[in-house]
């Protein structure tokens, strides 16, 4: 097409999350994307109107994206496979996917159509600044990306400064189902690490552990991402559902003598709240939960409110944590 003949004057090369050099059109007006973490960051830098195609994972949280994604924008199935025919028909300027979305296949299938594929792993907490900058570069929103990054990084710096010489407090982290914890390399590991927690399973070989091992390790705190539903939703869980999850934890065989249970040191986070800003919102809650006395100027609920209202453009809703955090906590 004629647009391709002049492409050499209107392209640029970016480096994606996994170090691939990708040639992109100078202006991106229509992007197909996968993964809610990517969708949230793109929204947070002010480029939501450039999203032309989404996977099922993004599509199903209608309220979280203001119902802007319609069924004809779907590029993937409920099972997570991508529909390359649909993407080719859509002919976006770029497909932005995650490393775990089989990007090699995407690259191969879309090359004949001249649709570039960018890998952006927004679910990795430790890559938040790099991925925000990458998306800022892709959409020409560098200034917004810079502002978003510094909002969160300044708070991480505060946590690091305040807790520099403080012994780490032990935490058992659980994701959704009993015994599903986090280890180095897993999606949740850095969220816990950046909160200066001592993850009791940091040397475990797999993310699924035996429940009785938690008893032996006797953590001082328990943090659980509580929704049984795998999908993230902006609508908070019902309070009675949170209470039931809390009670179920306390009633696990042999757990009543555990320090965390005796002290009522249990924090439940909704899927949505823990995940904000590549899980840095989760980090803020966990840090404050573990070290309330050391972090007087960190207010996680305030951070969550700003994430939701300023960056995602949504109304603030309470109920995403249990026990509830007040704005000034």
Q: Where is each model-derived feature located?
A:
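Short, low-complexity disordered leader/linker segments with a strong preference
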Residues: 1-27
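Extracytoplasmic substrate-binding proteins
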Residues: 10-11, 21-23, 105-180, 198-202, ...
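Short helix-initiation/N-cap motifs at beta->coil->alpha
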Residues: 17-19, 73-85, 204-211
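A local structural motif
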Residues: 22-25, 67-75, 194-204
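Structural recognition of the beta-strand scaffold that forms the well-ordered cores
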Residues: 30-34, 52-55, 94-98, 117-121, ...
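A short, structured surface patch at a secondary-structure boundary
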Residues: 33-90, 94-100
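Solvent-exposed loop/turn segments at secondary-structure junctions
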Residues: 37-40, 57-60, 94-95, 100-104, ...
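Flexible, glycine-rich surface segments
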Residues: 182-257
